[in-house]
Amino acid sequence: LGDVYKRQLVFHGQDPGEMLRLGIRFGKALQLINILRDIPSDLNIGRCYIPSVRLASLDMKVSDLKSEESMEKFRPLYNEYLDLACEYLDCAGDYISLIPRQHRRLRISCMLPVIIGWRTIRLMRRQNVLDQDKDVKIDRKQVVSILLKTRVASRFSNYESRLMRSERDLAQ
């Protein structure tokens, strides 16, 4: 994601190294959110992206993540990863701020997954993600609302800043 957009923006005077650094973190944010959201479904197909060493530090094994009762014990490590995803999303926000204002569609296409990511993190902080019966995702109505807000925000820098900041703050 970041690399594709970076190539477009190099022609607009942006530092390609900085765009690449931020773009990589942008991609990592979205990937980490998906990993953290999909733990039960990944376990069902024999995959786990949470390092065993990190689980062992909590006296846990991968198999413990198959039980929703393990969430309390897993929560500190899980929150640590959510915090890391927020840090990466902050870089995504910095990335968006480097996109020239006249490229509204590009700004919108970047803001949309960032805000969806923050809202997903907000849900993951409250829900037991190890519960296989509950999907952690925002509903279609919220996605439409976010799309409308980002379309307006792309026109007004003050509104864009407030929108991004408020979504970020609610995810913390």
Outline where the language-model segments fall.
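Short, small-residue-biased leader/transition segments that mark boundaries at the very start
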Residues: 1-5
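Catalytic cores of Mg2+-dependent Asp-rich isoprenoid enzymes
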Residues: 6-29, 36, 40-172
